[in-house]
Design a protein with these regions (language model features):
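Non-DNA-binding regulatory cores of transcription-related proteins
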Residues: 100-174, 180, 186
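Hydrophobic residues in alpha-helical segments
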Residues: 62-65, 94, 154
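Helix-rich terminal scaffold detector
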Residues: 1-49, 53-88, 183-187
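Juxtamembrane/interface motifs at transmembrane-helix termini
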Residues: 58-59, 91-96, 148-149, 185
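Residue-level signal for pocket-adjacent positions within structured domains
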Residues: 18, 26, 94-95, 126, ...
Length: 187
């Protein structure tokens, strides 16, 4: 069949649109306990709330007759595919997640996964970032993935250490100013 006669939505079940940066070869999908809880809560909400609502809308719209020009039906089916894709994605990511509690390093001056690190360099001055899992990093919030170049450069450094960060513009020298971890929770 010629591709000219297919709908653009024929490939809607591909998970390409939800792909996050791949894990490094042999790498693990590290995630903080709070990040794991957020992803799990999103998955359960999709399964228990969002998907059933859309299924009801699609069922109601399908009962209205002609589906080819039924906006509620067409939009509902599209939304259902999006939800199913996100459910598959979250399920896969949670299955391979390795929960790492950064509070176990509370009081340490060495940079490990989950650390909030303040570093300085000659170009940007001081900057604070938190090293998180791939699925929970958000650069707008100062959270970087543990596989990012800056996190890789800082991991295992101690307060006062100077590390090198290779960049396209040359090597930058970063000095670790402060390392913080969340406090240990009373278990």
């Amino acid at each position: 069949m010629s591709k000219a006669f297919t709908k653009e939505t024929d490939s809607a079940d591909d998970d390409e649109g939800l792909a996050l940066p791949p894990l490094p070869p042999g790498g693990k999908n590290y995630i903080t306990p709070s990040g794991y809880a957020r992803l799990r809560a999103e998955l359960l909400d999709l399964i228990d709330n969002e998907r059933p609502k859309i299924v009801d809308v699609v069922h109601w719209a399908a009962s209205n007759g002609d589906r080819s020009e039924n906006g509620d039906y067409l939009y509902g089916k599209k939304r259902l595919r999006e939800i199913d894709r996100r459910i598959r994605f979250l399920t896969k990511r949670l299955e391979i997640a390795e929960v790492v509690d950064p509070s176990l390093h509370a009081g340490s001056e060495q940079v490990f996964f989950g650390a909030t690190v303040t570093y300085s360099d000659d170009e940007d001055g001081e900057r604070t970032i938190t090293i998180m899992g791939i699925d929970e990093a958000d650069s707008r919030m100062g959270q970087v993935s543990w596989i990012s170049p800056v996190a890789r450069a800082l991991l295992k450094a101690h307060v006062g250490d100077e590390v090198q960060l290779p960049t396209p513009g040359g090597v930058r020298h970063l000095e670790v100013v402060e390392v913080q971890y969340p406090p240990r929770s009373a278990a």
